């Protein structure tokens, strides 16, 4: 007798094994007519029950709201500055490997090492693996659970207790051999398990975008630390150049003092200027060491591991004439934090369905098939057969409001996730607008400081010549020299700031993870 007679062959082949309980005949036993009639009657009942349950399972609804991608505030175009600088942001496809637009081989090499060896990225990958394992645990509920069992024991029952099923009435011990298979499967009529799987998928997407967000931070921090390092080295070079000028002025004042055309005050002021400039160098050396250590940490290396590689001076990486930043409509798909907020909202929506599913009855199909005998020679015979099959139903009746409280909690969490999504999108627009403004303003400041440096250089040469001619005193030379040093350092800092602003812009745009953790292969 086949369990699924009356159901479609597809149902029978896909959803459960075919059991021939009533047509199996042991070679050493005869059929029992009473058993066959009982089996036939029970078989028809099982046919009806199984087919009804399976049809209900396959046509079941899914409780709870379906997730719809939220609509957030959008802008049609990027903001444009009133006074545009030389390098402009353009709405063209953004380079996925944006750090290469600096055309600095050292920066490109360091970035590649960070992608491979950074410990924060490895931690994020570990968290992603945990999320995948958690999803596997949850999705396993969609499938039947099967197990094989087997046992042997020697027993003796009490002769003074309840009826002894062994037939020995407690007079002697007996053996018991038992083995078989068992299976159970929760029929997901209301879609509770499907909603759990949906929430697990969304939670996994949260972890995926968390990894992308960590990657984006590592990329930006590597570029920022490297650019700052080159900026500090250029500032030190400018300081050393000014130190040479100050020493030359000191030597000049000493010669003039020997000739009787200068005073001790001129020499003292020149010496003080030399000492003041020299005092700036230790702080710059310390800052260089800190930045090299910061890069070493990003590479997963011990302190000073990159000192020999990075201690040699190099120019600050320069920005290109045009910076491709993509279209505003691409932002939601590119920024990991927006994708993460959307996934959290998706998971919160699915969890409402899980909470609603708990109000409905749970129906589980369970069964077992095996053999049990007190003599090993009887094990496997027709008379040793044992089986059980049927549905189990669990329906919550009274729980003191716990289920209602859980549902209210899930709905409130969904509202929070929806607001968080809107806030994340709005914050992204503000960050990009601020970075666009900062990128343009930093260029204008750099260009103005470049002109200030040029004019101060002219002023210093003029002051030195006039001092030699006796037209002005040495205070004028020191004043102009101090102004030149200040403007030169400000120019180096502003030039560094332009490159840092571009890194901040790319970080705000959310680009850089596509080529490392693409969507199509990550899961």
Where are these regions (language model features)?
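Small/polar, glycine/serine/threonine/aspartate-rich low-complexity segments that form flexible
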Residues: 86-89, 93-102, 151-182, 305-324, ...
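Periplasmic alpha-helical coiled-coil/stalk elements that build and connect Gram-negative outer-membrane
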Residues: 62, 193, 202, 209-327, ...
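Alpha-helical hairpins and coiled-coil heptad-repeat segments
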Residues: 250-267, 459-477
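Bacterial Sec-pathway N-terminal export signals of envelope proteins
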Residues: 62-135, 316-346, 396-397, 422-425, ...
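Sec/SRP-type N-terminal targeting helices
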Residues: 122-123, 139, 187-215, 265, ...
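Short, low-complexity intrinsically disordered segments enriched in A/P/G/S/L with frequent Arg
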Residues: 16, 31-46
């Amino acid at each position: 007798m086949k369990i699924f007679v009356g159901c479609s062959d597809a149902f029978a082949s896909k959803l459960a094994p075919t059991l021939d309980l009533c047509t199996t005949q042991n070679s050493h036993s005869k059929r029992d007519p009473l058993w066959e009639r009982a089996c036939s009657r029970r078989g028809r009942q099982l046919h009806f029950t199984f087919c009804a349950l399976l049809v209900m399972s396959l046509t079941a609804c899914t409780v709870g709201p379906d997730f719809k991608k939220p609509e957030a505030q959008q802008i049609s175009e990027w903001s444009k500055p009133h006074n545009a600088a030389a390098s402009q942001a353009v709405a063209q496809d953004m380079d996925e490997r944006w750090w290469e637009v600096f055309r600095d081989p050292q920066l490109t090499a360091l970035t590649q090492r960070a992608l491979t060896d950074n410990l924060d990225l490895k931690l994020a990958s570990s968290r992603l693996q945990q999320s995948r394992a958690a999803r596997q645990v949850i999705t396993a509920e969609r499938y039947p659970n099967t197990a094989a069992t087997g046992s042997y024991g020697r027993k003796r029952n009490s002769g003074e207790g309840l009826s002894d099923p062994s037939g020995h009435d407690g007079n002697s011990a007996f053996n018991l051999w038992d083995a078989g298979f068992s299976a159970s499967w929760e029929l997901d009529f209301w879609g509770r398990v499907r909603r759990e799987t949906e929430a697990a998928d969304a939670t996994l997407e949260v972890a995926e975008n968390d990894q992308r967000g960590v990657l984006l931070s590592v990329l930006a921090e590597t570029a920022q630390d490297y650019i700052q390092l080159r900026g500090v080295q250029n500032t030190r070079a400018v300081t050393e150049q000014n130190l040479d000028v100050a020493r030359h002025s000191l030597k000049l004042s000493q010669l003039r003092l020997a000739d009787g055309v200068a005073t001790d005050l001129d020499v003292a002021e020149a010496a003080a200027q030399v000492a003041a400039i020299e005092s700036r160098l230790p702080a710059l050396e310390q800052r260089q060491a800190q930045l090299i250590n910061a890069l070493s940490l990003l590479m997963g290396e011990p302190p000073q591991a990159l000192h020999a590689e990075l201690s040699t001076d190099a120019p600050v990486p320069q920005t290109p004439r045009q910076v491709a930043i993509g279209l505003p409509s691409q932002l939601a798909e590119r920024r990991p934090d927006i994708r993460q907020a959307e996934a959290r909202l998706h998971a919160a929506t699915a969890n409402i369905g899980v909470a609603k599913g708990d109000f409905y009855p749970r129906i589980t199909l369970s069964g077992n098939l095996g053999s049990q005998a007190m003599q090993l020679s009887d094990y496997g015979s027709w008379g040793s057969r044992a089986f059980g099959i049927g549905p189990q139903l669990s329906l919550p009746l009274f729980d003191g409001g716990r289920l209602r409280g859980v549902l209210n909690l899930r709905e409130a969490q969904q509202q929070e996730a929806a607001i968080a999504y809107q806030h994340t999108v709005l914050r992204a627009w503000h960050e990009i607008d601020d970075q666009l403004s900062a990128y343009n303003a930093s260029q204008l400041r750099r260009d103005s400081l470049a002109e200030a440096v040029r004019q101060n250089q002219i002023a210093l040469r003029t002051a030195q010549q006039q001092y030699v001619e006796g037209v002005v005193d040495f205070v004028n030379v020191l004043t102009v020299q101090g102004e030149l040093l200040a403007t030169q350092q400000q120019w180096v800092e502003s030039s560094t700031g332009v490159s840092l602003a571009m890194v901040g812009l790319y970080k705000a745009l959310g680009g850089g993870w596509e080529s490392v953790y693409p969507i199509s292969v990550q899961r």
